């Protein structure tokens, strides 16, 4: 049943039909051709499984330019895709309504914010029956190769599902500033470098000493003054060395603490991933427990907050004493 507008895929088949229901709402159908027959599936995405490098594979610079052009971002490196925000907007572009851009953190700077965005992306993949497994644990690290592999796959997924409709990414974000995440390669613990001459104890004395008058012979400093100045310089050098040692120890302890937290996070993330795989294996059995587990895994922070509010209101309502009637 063809609709008023159609889009042709590269093989000549119609990729989308647009029809209207009884209420006049525009509903997209996506269809596939199997053995010469046309079959319709409601809201299904076209899955892409090929990840081999071909002539159509874009370079790192071309892929970033493509991302910035399509969704109006200002990314400069592939590693900045680790925030997941760009993928969320791509899904909203390909399948309007499958994800809420209000929940996407376009200004994400921390790893837990990246994970939040990828949880939203996972939920949209599940909603559209996308079979691709998102390697969240690798992507949020901001490593180049992991993020390049995923965006290369997503480019092919985009080409297979985009129907050519117009899309305004800035308007879709509703005014949210899409600030690129910081470069993951930057060192957090780098100390600012200062000029050795500026820190020299004799630099201030050289600037403050008045210019010698012409014709006058400058007096030589006594041995006592030279000894005192050299002693103060050695003491200041020792103080600076002690301060550097203390700062290095603090940096080392912070790095150890960070490694411990990351190991603990990876451990629990692996457990959740195993639970997710088990739920996906038994998802076709229509088990209520499996469905409830999937809802918990893919629930966003805002959704969890809303589910707790009604319970709190009910408890508050039960604790209120009954009002007395006025006579």
Curated annotation (Swiss-Prot):
<keyword id="KW-0206">Cytoskeleton</keyword>
<protein>
    <recommendedName>
        <fullName>Microtubule-associated protein RP/EB family member 2</fullName>
    </recommendedName>
</protein>
<dbReference type="InterPro" id="IPR036872">
    <property type="entry name" value="CH_dom_sf"/>
</dbReference>
<dbReference type="GO" id="GO:0019901">
    <property type="term" value="F:protein kinase binding"/>
</dbReference>
<keyword id="KW-0963">Cytoplasm</keyword>
<dbReference type="GO" id="GO:0005874">
    <property type="term" value="C:microtubule"/>
</dbReference>
<feature type="region of interest" description="Disordered">
    <location>
        <begin position="299"/>
        <end position="327"/>
    </location>
</feature>
<feature type="region of interest" description="DCTN1-binding">
    <location>
        <begin position="187"/>
        <end position="327"/>
    </location>
</feature>
<dbReference type="InterPro" id="IPR004953">
    <property type="entry name" value="EB1_C"/>
</dbReference>
<comment type="function">
    <text>May be involved in microtubule polymerization, and spindle function by stabilizing microtubules and anchoring them at centrosomes. May play a role in cell migration.</text>
</comment>
<dbReference type="GO" id="GO:0051301">
    <property type="term" value="P:cell division"/>
</dbReference>
<dbReference type="Pfam" id="PF00307">
    <property type="entry name" value="CH"/>
</dbReference>
<feature type="compositionally biased region" description="Low complexity">
    <location>
        <begin position="200"/>
        <end position="234"/>
    </location>
</feature>
<dbReference type="GO" id="GO:0120183">
    <property type="term" value="P:positive regulation of focal adhesion disassembly"/>
</dbReference>
<keyword id="KW-0131">Cell cycle</keyword>
<dbReference type="GO" id="GO:0051549">
    <property type="term" value="P:positive regulation of keratinocyte migration"/>
</dbReference>
<feature type="region of interest" description="Disordered">
    <location>
        <begin position="171"/>
        <end position="240"/>
    </location>
</feature>
<dbReference type="Pfam" id="PF03271">
    <property type="entry name" value="EB1"/>
</dbReference>
<feature type="modified residue" description="Phosphoserine">
    <location>
        <position position="9"/>
    </location>
</feature>
<dbReference type="InterPro" id="IPR036133">
    <property type="entry name" value="EB1_C_sf"/>
</dbReference>
<dbReference type="InterPro" id="IPR027328">
    <property type="entry name" value="MAPRE"/>
</dbReference>
<feature type="region of interest" description="Disordered">
    <location>
        <begin position="1"/>
        <end position="21"/>
    </location>
</feature>
<keyword id="KW-0493">Microtubule</keyword>
<feature type="compositionally biased region" description="Low complexity">
    <location>
        <begin position="318"/>
        <end position="327"/>
    </location>
</feature>
<dbReference type="GO" id="GO:0005737">
    <property type="term" value="C:cytoplasm"/>
</dbReference>
<dbReference type="GO" id="GO:0005925">
    <property type="term" value="C:focal adhesion"/>
</dbReference>
<feature type="compositionally biased region" description="Basic and acidic residues">
    <location>
        <begin position="300"/>
        <end position="317"/>
    </location>
</feature>
<feature type="region of interest" description="APC-binding">
    <location>
        <begin position="259"/>
        <end position="302"/>
    </location>
</feature>
<feature type="modified residue" description="Phosphoserine">
    <location>
        <position position="219"/>
    </location>
</feature>
<keyword id="KW-0597">Phosphoprotein</keyword>
<keyword id="KW-0498">Mitosis</keyword>
<keyword id="KW-0132">Cell division</keyword>
<comment type="similarity">
    <text>Belongs to the MAPRE family.</text>
</comment>
<dbReference type="GO" id="GO:0051010">
    <property type="term" value="F:microtubule plus-end binding"/>
</dbReference>
<dbReference type="GO" id="GO:0042802">
    <property type="term" value="F:identical protein binding"/>
</dbReference>
<comment type="subunit">
    <text>Interacts with DCTN1. Interacts with APC (via C-terminal). Interacts with monomeric and polymerized tubulin. Interacts with SLAIN1. Interacts (via the N-terminal region) with BAG1.</text>
</comment>
<feature type="domain" description="Calponin-homology (CH)">
    <location>
        <begin position="57"/>
        <end position="159"/>
    </location>
</feature>
<dbReference type="InterPro" id="IPR001715">
    <property type="entry name" value="CH_dom"/>
</dbReference>
<dbReference type="GO" id="GO:0032014">
    <property type="term" value="P:positive regulation of ARF protein signal transduction"/>
</dbReference>
<feature type="domain" description="EB1 C-terminal">
    <location>
        <begin position="236"/>
        <end position="306"/>
    </location>
</feature>
<feature type="modified residue" description="Phosphotyrosine">
    <location>
        <position position="167"/>
    </location>
</feature>
